[in-house]
């Protein structure tokens, strides 16, 4: 599926994971598990997590650790495929 189609489908998806003060290490396995069950997963980066960097930086780091692809970041939320 093209990136544009994935972004369109992501619009209606709710965030199912939240990254807070525990950092991204605490959600890597859960993101991987959810991606096994669904095509798209949205992750919201709470203020406590964003102290470690920008949303784009955190999203990229999480994608590398979970072997996922960042479809898009918007505000404090990232969508993975």
Residue spans of the language-model regions?
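Positively charged, polar, low-complexity stretches
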Residues: 1-81
């Amino acid at each position: 599926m093209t990136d544009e189609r994935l972004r369109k489908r992501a619009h209606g998806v709710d965030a199912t994971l939240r990254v807070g003060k525990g950092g991204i290490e605490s959600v890597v396995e859960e993101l991987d598990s959810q991606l096994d069950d669904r095509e798209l997963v949205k992750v919201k980066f709470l203020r406590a997590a964003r102290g470690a960097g920008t949303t784009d930086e955190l999203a990229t780091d999480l994608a590398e650790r979970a072997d996922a692809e960042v479809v898009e970041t918007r505000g404090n939320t990232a969508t993975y495929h």
